[in-house]
Swiss-Prot record:
Family (UniProt): Belongs to the LIMR family.
Stored PANTHER family: G-PROTEIN COUPLED RECEPTOR-ASSOCIATED PROTEIN LMBRD2
TM helices/strands, residue ranges: 4-26, 31-51, 107-127, 145-165, 182-202, 382-402, 427-447, 468-488, 515-535
Protein name, entry field: LMBR1 domain-containing protein 2 homolog
Residue intervals annotated with topology Cytoplasmic: 27-30, 128-144, 203-381, 448-467, 536-694
Subcellular location: Membrane
Length: 694
């Protein structure tokens, strides 16, 4: 009967692996980063998939306890047979031995806490450190985390003083409860923010995406903003590299700091180095980022600029990749707008991509037209209605789940009705659906979070290691409070609704939906009110309006700035389309020229290679081969620069050429124009080790 648990473990591992493959670049990132993020994501998904099994197991144990026959006081039972479960209680599908869930939750809890509070923060700080030795990087990572955790220790000290003043005794169990309450408090308040935004934004985004005109206008707006961010990232990189060029001229080759400078220069792409050298020569070292000082810098100065180089190059690479993705999105939406009124009902693309035979059979042009132009909009609107209904149920249950008599929570009433008939299958399915919606709302908001343009999960293998580690930390810290909130909504947290049901194994190990005692008074009032306030603020777009008033452009209809940015996005996309058209025309001309050259020179080349009777002599001169009259199988154009010949490059090649070979990074980026025959390409060798800078 444990096949559901096995299926949940496999599904969690599969989803974590697929997500890591989509967002990360597994062949390029370090193996420790891959394993840590995979473990964090897998445990977070596993908690969501396993909670329904724990709920049904708890309800089954309660059923057995309620229907257990009471033995008569004067009757001695001499039978040695084991008493089976009552006939009213049927084992749920996911029933496992009693020792499985306690051991599973302990493994998940302590592994997640160890990863999210110790290992992953140290790894993140190590990756951002600009030192040039292992000892220096570890020292910087420890100092940064000591400052971070020092604030937590200060808060804990204040709480301990508060408890001591009240005259309460402290032991290990109470300290553990305080730590669990503090963690739950942090997670619950962050959950309020994420759910309050997502419960409104998820249905609204589905409805807006069902309107092709609105989606296209918003895509133009995002393209204009990404273009601005890309230009700012390029300017920031140029300023830092000009300063680096000045240091390169100041530090002599035989100086002890020269190897440190060479370590920084090896991370800078060749193209960017050459451009920085030209800018430095043109401005004479008087640019914004340049320095004209002849004083030798200290090692701390090099560490600081090394850290700036790492951060600026990551930002530039991410903006380049996101710009390419956004261009493909806009081009696709334009194709949809042009094909809506097509008479032959076949989807035609302005820039068609080469598709495999299987794609042409399973997803033909006619089928694509029916989906993109006829069925997709009604499907998205239907999903909008369903998610809006689910959001309304969640908000109502959040507002009323503290009510014991009468029970007003919708989710709690559904569980009670199914429990009365011992319909464990309905309980499992309903719990899974609700948790998956919580999961989608919370995690989709995390995937769109941007902190100072540093942490951002970009698809198509464009997410750096810092952002992957940060997302793993955030998921490990948010998943337990999210599941505790769900157990509170269905009235299965005994600290909220006592003496009603048995306690789940999850709450026994992970703790309860408790908060710090100082703020626990009135928590059942301000927690739902905060959730409702965030939902209303998102519904009326108060956050977007406030950011727009502060100068951060947001997509608001009937706003002059938004209209100007939409028009700017149209112009940028039109320029990009002209560039692609010129590249395609140049490639077609080169293809025709090569074909004509091969036809006209085939006879001459065959005689030239034969060297036999009637042919050319086999003697060679130094001038032979200058006009490509050698072996036709060797294509010089294949090794030439594709940009110089006007050949359109893939997005991966554009980014790799932009960042150069010196970065030792080949971006495995797959855009919608990715061809099937490129599947056999090797992304590149894995990194040399964790300490490449040493």
């Amino acid at each position: 009967m444990a096949y559901l648990l096995s299926f949940g473990i496999v599904a969690a591992l599969f989803l974590a692996s697929i997500s890591l493959y989509r967002y990360g670049n597994i062949p390029r990132q370090h193996i420790l980063v891959t394993l840590s993020v995979l473990t964090a994501w897998c445990f977070s998904f596993l908690i969501v998939f396993t909670i329904p099994l724990d709920v049904t197991s708890t309800l089954y144990r309660q059923c057995v306890e309620e229907h257990r026959p009471t033995p008569a006081p004067n009757v001695t039972n001499t039978s040695s047979a084991t008493v089976g479960p009552p006939p009213q209680c049927q084992e749920p599908w996911g029933m496992v031995p009693a020792s499985v869930f306690p051991n599973l939750w302990r493994i998940i809890y302590w592994s997640s806490q160890f990863l999210t509070w110790l290992i992953m923060p140290l790894m993140q700080s190590y990756l951002k450190a600009g030192d040039f030795t292992v000892k220096g990087k570890l020292k910087s990572a420890l100092i940064e985390n000591a400052i971070y955790y020092g604030s937590y220790l200060f808060i804990c000290g204040v709480l301990l003083i508060y408890i001591a003043v009240k005259g309460e005794s402290l032991d290990w169990q109470k300290l553990k409860a305080i730590a669990s309450s503090a963690s739950n408090t942090w997670g619950l308040f962050l959950l309020i923010l994420l759910l309050g935004y997502a419960l409104v934004e998820v249905p609204r985004s589905l409805w807006n995406n069902a309107k092709p005109g609105f989606a296209l206008q918003y895509a133009y707006f995002k393209a204009a903003k990404l273009s601005t961010e890309k230009a700012e990232a390029e300017e920031h990189v140029d300023d830092i590299l000009e300063s680096l060029q000045g240091l390169s001229r100041v530090i002599p080759n035989n100086h002890e700091l020269r190897p440190c400078l060479e370590t920084i220069l090896r991370k800078v792409p060749i193209e960017l180095q050459e451009r920085a050298s030209r800018n430095f020569a043109r401005t004479g070292g008087s640019g914004m980022g340049a320095t004209s000082s002849t004083i030798l810098p200290s090692e701390k100065a090099l560490v600081r600029i090394h850290k700036q180089v790492i951060k600026s190059l990551q930002t530039l690479q991410r903006t380049e990749a996101l710009w390419s993705v956004q261009v493909q999105t806009v081009l696709h939406l334009e194709d949809v707008a042009k094909n809506i009124h097509s008479s032959d009902r076949r989807f035609k693309s302005e820039f068609p991509r080469q598709r495999t035979q299987l794609e042409r059979i399973c997803y033909s042009a006619s089928l694509q037209w029916y989906w993109e132009c006829l069925l997709k909009a009604p499907f998205l609107k239907t999903m909008c209605v369903l998610t809006a209904t689910m959001s309304a149920m969640v908000v109502w249950s959040e507002l009323t789940f503290f009510s014991r008599h009468p029970v007003l929570s919708i989710f709690a009433n559904v569980i009670y009705v199914a429990k009365e008939s011992y319909d464990f299958f309905t309980i499992e399915v309903f719990s899974m659906v609700v948790l998956c919606y919580f999961f989608y709302c919370t995690y989709s908001t995390i995937l769109r979070i941007r902190f100072l343009n540093l942490y951002y999960l970009a698809p198509h293998h464009q997410t750096n290691e810092h952002s992957l580690i940060f997302s793993g930390m955030l998921l490990c810290r948010l998943t337990p409070p999210m599941c505790l909130n769900f157990l509170g909504l269905i009235h299965m947290d005994t600290h909220i609704i006592p003496n009603r049901i048995m306690e789940t194994v999850y709450t026994q190990i992970m703790g309860h939906m408790d908060v710090i005692g100082i703020i626990s008074n009135g928590f059942n009032i301000y927690f739902p009110m905060c959730m409702l306030a965030f939902c209303l603020a998102t519904w009326f777009s108060l956050g977007s309006r406030a950011l727009n008033a502060l100068g951060f452009q947001q997509f608001l209809q009937n706003e002059t700035i938004a209209t100007e940015l939409v028009q700017e996005g149209k112009d940028l996309i039109a320029r990009e389309k002209r560039r692609r058209q010129r590249a395609e025309e140049a490639m077609a001309r080169r293809r025709d020229f090569n074909r004509t050259d091969q036809v006209l020179g085939s006879d001459y080349l065959s005689k030239y290679r034969s060297g036999g009777p009637g042919g050319l002599t086999s003697s060679r001169t130094p001038a032979d081969g200058l006009l490509r009259d050698g072996d036709g199988s060797f294509d010089y154009a294949a090794v030439a620069s594709s940009s110089a010949l006007g050949v359109p490059r893939s997005l991966s090649e554009e980014i790799n050429d932009r960042f150069g070979v010196s970065t030792q990074v080949q971006v495995g980026f797959r855009d919608p124009d990715y061809e099937a025959e490129t599947d056999g390409r090797i992304v590149g060798p894995p990194p040399r080790g964790l300490f490449d800078d040493v």
